Design a protein with these regions (language model features):
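Short, flexible turn/loop "capping" segments at secondary-structure junctions
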Residues: 3-5, 72-79, 149-151
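M16/insulysin-pitrilysin zinc metalloprotease superfamily fold
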Residues: 37, 48, 72-130
Length: 193
């Protein structure tokens, strides 16, 4: 897509299972590892962090100026999205190639125990922060009933902590396939309004 402006954006969408699917938890850890943990409800985004793989591979190397990932807990299968703001000195194809290279790396090389521990810790912290008061706990219990049941909320941290490197590699290969994604690119046309 082309239009007025000076900034190029890319959004990549992969299919993502429902929150009650067993693959949801390894994919949530993979999201935390790649882009920083997501706030799993539809009303909030995730956080970007400088320790994530995509930040180091794309922002630090100046392919993009920002990268965010996002997954939502839903009753039906939905999407996992990665949104990038392309660096002004780069072409969108370069940013997408760098993203693909990093995704291929997680598919082929086992994630280290340290990375998994950090990713789970970050996802746990975001979940704890999002459910620290009684209002948010009530929201999560009700929201969990919509897509699974209240037990999902009560066992979320336990299931997250059980994710292994093998689980992450398996879901990366299953869900992050180039042929199973949609890529949208906004290419600015400076001088047009």
């Amino acid at each position: 897509m082309e239009g007025p402006g000076a900034t190029c954006y890319i959004q990549v969408c992969y299919r993502f299972p429902s929150a009650s699917h067993p693959d949801f938890f390894p994919l949530s850890v993979l999201d935390s590892l790649l882009a920083g943990p997501s706030n799993l409800n539809m009303f909030s985004g995730g956080i970007s962090n400088k320790t994530s793989r995509l930040y180091r591979a794309l922002v630090d190397k100046e392919y993009v100026v920002s990268v965010h990932g996002g997954a939502q807990a839903t009753i039906d299968p939905f999407m996992y999205t990665i949104t990038m703001t392309v660096h002004p000195r780069r072409k969108p194809e370069e940013a997408l190639a760098a993203l693909d290279k990093e995704i291929q790396r997680v598919k082929e090389q086992k994630v280290t125990k340290e990375e998994i521990t950090r990713a789970i810790k970050q996802a746990r912290a975001l979940f704890a922060y999002g459910s620290e008061n009684i209002t948010n706990q009530g929201f999560w219990l009700g929201y969990a009933e919509m897509f699974a049941n209240y037990n999902w909320f009560e066992t979320y941290l336990e299931k997250l902590s059980a994710v292994t490197a093998k689980d992450i590699q398996q879901v990366a290969n299953e869900y992050l396939k180039p042929q199973s994604r949609v890529v949208g690119t906004y290419v600015p046309q400076e001088g047009k309004s």
